[in-house]
């Protein structure tokens, strides 16, 4: 990248409204960008229509605005990026780095859950088939800005993973890498639930010959049952009233210093102080933590 300026991002999928766990990821990435005098992008990852909730994308953008998390530039919509994904797939194909696969989930489960390369040299066509990366650059470990060196599950890291689904949808790992490169993202701050796919994404960067960003994975907030706060687990949406208490709650979760008189501060002043006091090193190094602290 010719521009050395910090560029971060928050990239939610419109499968429901933002909840407290989402706020942690959004706030962490926002504070890291602002503390580095950088740019903070927002991308809507709307490439999986069966999982999307009508109106959720607009609600997410309104929630971010309500919570004072104002992004730079235009929102990028993955649903408008299909041509870029097709070009990336075509390039991989031209380099001999992809192949079609008709293996079912049942077959992969029967061989232990990790794809074994069964279709790699069969020369199959596109009909009723997924497209897989021909893995030539497995990434067995990477450095996380919070957790240090993280070691991958080696069979998973060496797997020829799907880059275009059998149902015609673009795979998450392909789309996220193409878009992060397009947007010039220099560091990705997100939840620890995305640690596992990181080695696949770095591997894709290497196959394309692109510089991978840095990574910082934040701890996941757990509900009272010990499960991750998520839309699938029916985590409640962020409150619509005064956003400051939830911002303070998220800052506490991230183990950050908070002004004693925060209730006397405006939303903008509270966030400005949070930027000035931001210390990622103080975040708990565990990958999960209770939401109520």
From Swiss-Prot:
> What cellular component terms from Gene Ontology apply here?
cytosol
Q: Which cofactor does it need?
A: Zn(2+)
- EC nos: 6.1.1.-
Q: Which amino acids does the record list as binding Zn(2+)?
A: 101, 103, 115, 119
Which residues does the record give as ATP binding sites?
231
| UniProt KW ATP-binding keyword | yes
Q: Look up keyword ATP-binding and say if it applies.
A: yes
User: From which domain of life does this come?
Assistant: Bacteria
Q: Which GO terms describe its biological process?
A: glutamyl-tRNA aminoacylation; tRNA modification
Question: What does the cofactor section's free text say about binding?
Answer: Binds 1 zinc ion per subunit.
- Cited Gene3D superfamilies: HUPs
Q: Which UniProt keywords apply?
A: Aminoacyl-tRNA synthetase, ATP-binding, Ligase, Metal-binding, Nucleotide-binding, Zinc
Q: Which residues bind L-glutamate?
A: 9-13, 45, 172, 190
Task: Please report, in chain numbering, the residue ranges of the motif 'HIGH' region.
Answer: 12-22
Q: Which InterPro entries match?
A: Glu-Q_tRNA(Asp)_Synthase, Glu/Gln-tRNA-synth, Glu/Gln-tRNA-synth_Ib_cat-dom, GluQ/Sye, Rossmann-like_a/b/a_fold
Disulfide bridge positions per record: none
What GO molecular function annotation could you give as one example from this UniProt entry? Answer: zinc ion binding
| Residue positions of motif 'KMSKS' region | 228-232
Described by its record, this protein's role is as follows: Catalyzes the tRNA-independent activation of glutamate in presence of ATP and the subsequent transfer of glutamate onto a tRNA(Asp). Glutamate is transferred on the 2-amino-5-(4,5-dihydroxy-2-cyclopenten-1-yl) moiety of the queuosine in the wobble position of the QUC anticodon.
Similarity comment: family membership: Belongs to the class-I aminoacyl-tRNA synthetase family. GluQ subfamily.
NCBIfam families referenced in this protein's UniProt entry, alphabetically = PRK05710.1-1, PRK05710.1-3, queuosine_YadB
Report what the protein is called. Answer: Glutamyl-Q tRNA(Asp) synthetase
Traced from the root, the source organism's taxonomic lineage reads: Bacteria, Pseudomonadati, Pseudomonadota, Gammaproteobacteria, Enterobacterales
């Amino acid at each position: 990248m010719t521009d050395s300026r910090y560029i971060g991002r928050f990239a939610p999928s419109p499968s429901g409204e933002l909840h407290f766990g989402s706020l942690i990821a959004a706030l962490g990435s926002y504070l890291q960008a602002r503390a580095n005098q950088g740019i903070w992008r927002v991308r809507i990852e709307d490439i999986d229509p069966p999982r999307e909730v009508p109106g959720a994308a607009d609600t997410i953008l309104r929630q971010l605005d309500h919570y004072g998390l104002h992004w730079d530039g235009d929102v990028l919509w993955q649903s408008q990026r299909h041509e870029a994904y097709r070009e990336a797939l075509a390039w991989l194909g031209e380099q001999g780095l992809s192949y079609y696969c008709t293996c079912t989930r049942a077959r992969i489960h029967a061989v232990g859950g990790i794809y074994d390369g069964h279709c790699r040299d069969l020369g199959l066509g596109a009909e009723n088939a997924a497209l897989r990366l021909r893995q030539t650059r497995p990434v067995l470990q990477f450095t996380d800005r919070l957790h240090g060196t993280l070691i991958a599950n080696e069979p998973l890291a060496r797997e020829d993973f799907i880059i275009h689904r059998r149902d015609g949808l673009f795979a998450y790992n392909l789309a996220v890498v193409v878009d992060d490169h397009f947007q010039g993202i220099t560091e990705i701050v997100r939840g620890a639930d995305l640690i596992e796919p990181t080695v696949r994404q770095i591997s894709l960067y290497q196959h394309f010959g692109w510089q991978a960003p840095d990574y910082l994975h934040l701890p996941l907030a757990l509900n009272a049952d010990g499960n991750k706060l998520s839309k699938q687990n029916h985590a409640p949406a962020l409150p619509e009233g005064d956003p400051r208490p939830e911002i303070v709650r998220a800052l506490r979760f991230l183990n950050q210093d908070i002004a004693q008189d925060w209730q006397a501060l405006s939303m903008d002043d509270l966030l400005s102080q949070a930027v000035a006091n931001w210390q990622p090193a103080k975040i708990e190094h565990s990958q999960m933590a209770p939401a109520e602290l």
